Amino acid sequence: MRALIQRVSEASVTVEGELLGEIGPGLLILVCAMQGDGEDQASALAARIAKLRIFKDEAGKMNRSVRDTGGAALVVSQFTLAADTSRGNRPGFSAAAPPADGERLYRHFAAEIAACGIPTATGRFGADMKVRLLNDGPVTIWMES
């Protein structure tokens, strides 16, 4: 699985004008299941992100996790993280998991983040979503499992 993690002051996701999820301080996690991924990869990535120390401590160093700060997570599916731009001008997405697998793993990943004790909001898999965020830092991290 691939994830793009952004430290945010706030973030929200809407579909067709309906607010699906919003958080205050925490993480916006854009996530994509890849061909061959399974629940083990989703669980491992969620556990790593839950422990990722990218929030400042009292000394101003990135030494605290979202869980340590009492922050939340907004998990949004984004198959375009599987883009192959090595040839031509149009990205290919054949490395992404098939939609049924992608949705199952997206839901599993979000549930694993929540199981780590992090309040979790989600988007809607496969929908045309509008994501708003206020970056904090900015801090943006790319992770794979």
Curated annotation (Swiss-Prot):
<keyword id="KW-0820">tRNA-binding</keyword>
<dbReference type="GO" id="GO:0106026">
    <property type="term" value="F:Gly-tRNA(Ala) deacylase activity"/>
</dbReference>
<comment type="subunit">
    <text>Homodimer.</text>
</comment>
<dbReference type="GO" id="GO:0005737">
    <property type="term" value="C:cytoplasm"/>
</dbReference>
<feature type="short sequence motif" description="Gly-cisPro motif, important for rejection of L-amino acids">
    <location>
        <begin position="137"/>
        <end position="138"/>
    </location>
</feature>
<dbReference type="GO" id="GO:0043908">
    <property type="term" value="F:Ser(Gly)-tRNA(Ala) hydrolase activity"/>
</dbReference>
<dbReference type="GO" id="GO:0019478">
    <property type="term" value="P:D-amino acid catabolic process"/>
</dbReference>
<keyword id="KW-0694">RNA-binding</keyword>
<dbReference type="GO" id="GO:0051500">
    <property type="term" value="F:D-tyrosyl-tRNA(Tyr) deacylase activity"/>
</dbReference>
<keyword id="KW-0963">Cytoplasm</keyword>
<protein>
    <recommendedName>
        <fullName>D-aminoacyl-tRNA deacylase</fullName>
        <ecNumber>3.1.1.96</ecNumber>
    </recommendedName>
</protein>
<dbReference type="InterPro" id="IPR003732">
    <property type="entry name" value="Daa-tRNA_deacyls_DTD"/>
</dbReference>
<comment type="function">
    <text>An aminoacyl-tRNA editing enzyme that deacylates mischarged D-aminoacyl-tRNAs. Also deacylates mischarged glycyl-tRNA(Ala), protecting cells against glycine mischarging by AlaRS. Acts via tRNA-based rather than protein-based catalysis; rejects L-amino acids rather than detecting D-amino acids in the active site. By recycling D-aminoacyl-tRNA to D-amino acids and free tRNA molecules, this enzyme counteracts the toxicity associated with the formation of D-aminoacyl-tRNA entities in vivo and helps enforce protein L-homochirality.</text>
</comment>
<dbReference type="GO" id="GO:0000049">
    <property type="term" value="F:tRNA binding"/>
</dbReference>
<comment type="similarity">
    <text>Belongs to the DTD family.</text>
</comment>
<keyword id="KW-0378">Hydrolase</keyword>
<dbReference type="InterPro" id="IPR023509">
    <property type="entry name" value="DTD-like_sf"/>
</dbReference>
<dbReference type="Pfam" id="PF02580">
    <property type="entry name" value="Tyr_Deacylase"/>
</dbReference>
